[in-house]
Amino acid sequence: MSLKNKRLTLFQIRPGLVQTAYANGSSTSYITNELGVPVAFTPTGVKHLHHRAVQFPIGVYFEANGHGTVVFDEKTQQLIRTKGGSKLNALMDVINQTVGDAISDMLLVECVLADRDWDCDQWFNCYKDLPNRF
């Protein structure tokens, strides 16, 4: 299983993910080791996550409370607009890069799952959360 999109690989675009210390360690391990995506950590708060995410060509951030989004730098947006194909363009249009939006984020998840021909069970079984120590 790989996150690598052939077009992103072709364009040498490296996405990055930003989490806080509240993220489940299993997700961090899966993202780093299985998907090969670098993970950065920030203090809690969207302002910290967003500031770090914009330092990646494609930055993904989310907090355990559900806040988050995907951001694209200008060069990546231009590359996707001109050479990315209809699917990547459509995904970029769905995303609210400014503040995130739970509805558009879920629509994005649905689009990715449909493209991979996955159901929710397959998605949920990608990795197992580490148990809460409290």
What is each stretch, according to the model?
Residues 1-134:
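Phosphate-binding and adjacent anionic-ligand microenvironments
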